[in-house]
Design a protein with these regions (language model features):
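Catalytic core of PPM/PP2C metal-dependent serine/threonine phosphatase domains
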Residues: 1-5, 17-98, 105, 119-122, ...
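Sensory beta-strand/linker motifs that couple input domains to effectors
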Residues: 8
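DG-centered beta-turn motif at the end of beta-strands
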Residues: 11, 91, 140-142, 193
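Active-site-proximal, acidic helix/loop segment immediately C-terminal to a metal-coordinating Asp/Glu
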Residues: 16-40, 102, 130-188
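Residues that scaffold the ATP/ADP-binding catalytic core of kinase and kinase-like folds
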Residues: 96, 114, 146-147
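Exposed aromatic-hydrophobic patches
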Residues: 123-129
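Short coil/turn segments at secondary-structure boundaries
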Residues: 177, 192-195
Length: 201
């Protein structure tokens, strides 16, 4: 829209029906936001999504907390303007360059769940898109929190970042992470959905 592309990675509350319910609502609201709002500011998109969620879940009427909500990361970029922006609601971004992997932390607040004062004032990370491409990765805590190994510990962020650093490209990184998490999990129960998104610009 107007030369800007928006990518959203979201991790909704719950499993089964509650998770599907939040996924459907959030997807519908994001479609609405994309049709009526500017797509160049990820912080505004997160703020608008939280406002619409409050109305959809009737939080502004009941003033009560709910178990329905989500964590999300929003990437906005323009190939014409050569600008990339990111804002996160309890979700971080990882940028791989020739110098290594850099963690861009999102804000420590989720969307939904309870009534909030707006605007939420999410931080915005911005960088220029150079001729030499960068790789970007966003993933949910289902990846890092998977229990496995001999000591039945969580997979952890360090293992994810190791796979990103060692991979030759984005596709290899994603495939290697998924395969390594499954290997690490072994016979242990899957704790959560695995959401992992990588792309190069």
């Amino acid at each position: 829209k107007n030369g800007w592309t928006c990518l959203v990675v979201a991790d909704c509350t719950g499993h089964g029906i509650p998770g599907a319910f939040m996924t459907l609502i959030s997807s519908t609201l994001l479609d609405r936001i994309s049709s009526i709002k500017d797509l160049s500011h990820p912080d505004t998109i997160l703020n608008d999504l939280d406002e619409f969620l409050q109305k959809s879940l009737s939080l502004d009427d009941t003033h009560q907390e709910t178990d329905f909500g989500l964590d999300a990361g929003v990437c906005c970029f323009s190939l014409d303007a050569k600008i990339f922006r990111y804002s996160g609601a309890k979700m971080n971004l990882y940028q791989k360059t020739d110098q290594g992997v850099v963690e861009i932390k999102g804000d420590k607040k989720s969307l939904g769940y309870d009534i909030k004062e707006h605007p939420l004032n999410f931080k915005v990370f911005e960088c220029a898109l150079n001729e030499k491409p960068s790789s970007f990765f966003v993933f949910s805590d289902g990846v890092t929190d998977q229990v496995g190994g001999e000591k039945k510990l969580m997979y952890g962020k360090k293992r994810v970042l190791h796979q990103i650093r060692e991979a030759v490209d984005v596709k290899a990184a994603v495939n290697n992470i998924v395969a390594d998490v499954e290997r690490y999990q072994g016979v242990n129960k899957r704790r959560d959905d695995l959401t992992l998104f990588g792309f190069a610009l």
